[in-house]
């Protein structure tokens, strides 16, 4: 949660936005509350505490109403509850979740100045009165019985930035009619990590590669570049299960690591991931990164891996999905397909040179802005006569759904190569 201070806005400023019926305090995610306090500015923590009574009143009225506002798939609700009964419901779990009458309840115990619920639902957790260290969130969700929602908690210390520290999760809530989980099993395919020296980036960059089983027989397989390539280790098991079941084509997954350090304490004073993934920032880093992928990584993969010369698939989730769309628009000589899952920022127009690029676009019902942007981009592509599949899932900005959707995306983008097609 949070964002960058736009042009003309004080980087120390705190602003508000409404999300799911709640007024939320936000600020530039690279600025800490300690920096704001040192400058005599209001902090995000102070504004959040000031907003809490009004937010509770609105959420209590919404709980009593029993429904959802028109056009909304999710809304915050609240009912005053006894701390002891909540603790009993939490039991020994640090993070707990359950459903009652279409309402998802979440409890977390931990120390923080502020706590943020992340994953498929992204909202501040509220402190429970009379129970220091106990935090709660309740949301009414349309189609909750069909939903899969990953839940995590980011704990933000006094004076910290909006990043915070991962404190709990992931806990996966699964509705009574939700898709079944794919059982964990050891990979039969190969998973390897490489470090590539890049002349265009002027620095080394990690690449994680998944090669499906049976790929060593001399044949060549389609290739898919995945943004945020550290996540290939999480995507590979679901993809391999689909390949073995015949519902996805055997595909080599090449994951190009993003530029951001994993440790929040070592993050630079710039969002390097966004600068590389989003052309809207007009940074030279975007062009350099795209050239690195198209002109260095893909030729490297062609010489080392059992992958066909092309065209390749560009895939990603969140800002990585925006990158995949931009890659298809700007380098149709390399990418013949795009798998964009939860892309929040899309181009303003369709590049004429990209008319033959196939697009698989998908978003969750619980990420309204991204859902709307995805639908608008799909409609724009369809108006130009381009091949486009548009899907939605009953969930949010959630890696469970991203991992589930990639095999379906590859099956659609590479028609006729899955055994079940």
Q: What kind of region is each of these model predictions?
A:
Residues 1-11:
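Compositionally biased, low-complexity flexible segments
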Residues 12-14, 24:
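N-terminal amphipathic/hydrophobic targeting modules at extreme N-termini
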